[in-house]
Amino acid sequence: MENECIFVSSRGILKSTNIHTVQFSSSNPLILLDDYKNITKGSIVYVCNSAIKNFIQTVLPTLKDTFVLVSGDSDVSVPDDILSITEFNSFLEDPRLQHWFCQNLVVPTNSIHRKLSHLPIGLDYHTISSPGNQHPWGLHELPTVQEKQLLEQLEKNKTLQQKVFLAYSNFHHAIWGIGQRGDRQEAVNKIPKDCVYYEPNFTSRDVAWAHQSQFHYVLSPKGGGYDCHRTWEALCLGCIPIVKSSNLDPLYTNLPVLIVKDWSDISQTLLKETYETFSKTRFNMRTLYLSHWVARFKEESAKC
């Protein structure tokens, strides 16, 4: 269902490949060999980032043809959390690997291999899409219905007379958890309080979308991994996400994202100057759309 949506999402990417597991489970480190027995020349293969090492050990030795790899659906950093540098480089140089599109890729910008491309985690349509799944974000809704809600909010935003020159925050309701989210606590400690509107209470996601749409900026520290769904929600809603500089910076090329070296760099002056600059800049928003990435996958597949 996510592959029928307009905007890029983790599961939309997964379901747009022609070889992938049929039992979706985020951060699953194991490969089901039967899911990968039909890889042929030009196949676009999806593997959970947590299972990359298992894929290299169990599936790769059985392959003869060149393929395109797409990976994500996990908070682990690639390669740091899953492969040694030797294993990583050896895999990249394997002639059967045509190209690798990877989420949470933390290779230094100046040493990106020619076969590597950053891939956004995009929106999260899957968390509340399972029937009977109760979640603080809201009631069960199909991915297409969730996207319809987002598009309706985007349409409402056109009637806003003026946005507030502050950065909206709701991440502070989940400071601790996966990976301890130390970046979030650092953001709270360092960002001047007069630059931020902190949502006083935890809200459902649709309410959060409505509230953040009233502000020019949205604070987006790390999620469970380096990338965060909040960043992509903000962009889709017409807000400017603020992120701390990292090896993910290439993901934001040609997008209205404010990247700061340190959270303490944020100021009222920076917010106003950035808005003035961005309002005169022509951005290319194509990376927000699932169709862009599917076309990229097929382009590499055609080279096999």
Regions found by a protein language model. Name each.
Residues 1-229, 240, 244-259, 269-304:
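Nucleotide-sugar donor-binding catalytic core of glycosyltransferases
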Residues 263-264:
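Short helix-start
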Residues 235:
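Short alpha-helix at the nucleotide-sugar/activated-sugar donor binding site of glycosyltransferases
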